[in-house]
Amino acid sequence: MLSAFVLLLACLGLGVGVARYARPPIGLAQALNWWVIQIALPALVLGIVPSLHFDTALWFLVVTQWGVFFGAWALIAWVGARAHWSRGTIGGLILVTGLGNTSFLGYPLLEALRGRAGLQLGVVADQLGCFIMLAVGGVLVAARYGGATVTPTEMLRRVLLFPAFIALVVGVIVGQLGGWPDMLATMLDRFALTLVPLALFSVGLRFKLKPQPGQWAPVALALSWKLLLAPLLALGLALLTGVGGAVMSIGILQTAMAPMISAAILADQHYLDPPLANTVLGVGILLSLITVPLWSLALP
C-alpha cells in the first residue's frame, strides 16, 4: 500500500512542481488527458473485465456506487441552481462528486485494510458499479452540462462511442470466449499502467491545494458528500436491507473513496470548470487517506 501512496503523491507533486517551476509545453495537460481517456483507461478495462465474475448476492456493491452518482447529481444540481453556479461548475462537480477512486486508490487501501478477500469484492464495486457510471452516467453529464444543447440521440451516440464503454462491451465478450491470449493480456497491462502516473501528473499541472475565492462552498459540499454523507447513506441501506459482513463493509468503503481521477479528466475535456474539479480531486485524495481508514475502523 505504501508504494501505491508514494506513486500517487509523487506524480501529483511532480505535476505541481513542473507547473510552478518549469515551462511545460502549451496543451500538455490536454494531450495527457487524451491518452488517459482514449488509450490507458480502455486498456485497463479490457484487461480486467474478462476475468470478472458477478454473483447476484453482491448487488449491494454495485447499487451503492450507482446511488453515489445519482445522489450527487441530484444534490449538486439542486444546490447549484439555488446558488446560481454555472452549468460548467455543476457538471464538473457532479463528475468528481459522484464517481469515486475505487481502483487506483481503492484497491491498495482495501487490500491493506481488509486483505485480499476485501480487494476481490472491491473489484466488483469498481468495475460493475463505479466504472459503468463513468462510461454511461459520466458521459451523459458531460454532454448535458458541456455547453450546447444535446439531443437524446446524440447523448446515446456519445455513450456508445465512449472508448471505455466500447472496451467494457468487448471485455464482456472476450470473457465469455475464454479471455485474452497471454501476449495480448500483457500488452494491455502495460498500456493500463500508464493511466495513474499520467493522469495524476496532468491533475498536478492544474492543482491548487487551497481553493480559490468562490470555490470554498463547492469544494466543501462535494467532499462532504463523497467522504461522509454517501457512506452514511450506504450504511443506512445496508441496515434496511439486512446486508452485512464483508459485503457491507467493502461496499461502504468503496463509496467513501476519494473522487475519481478519470472524472476530473473528463471534466477537463468538456470544459466543466477544470480548476474546481482538479482542486476537489487533489484535496479529496489527501483527506481520504485519513477518512477511509477511519471508516474501516468503524465498520465490522
PLM regions: where:
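Alpha-helical transmembrane segments of multi-pass small-molecule/ion transporters
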Residues: 1-300
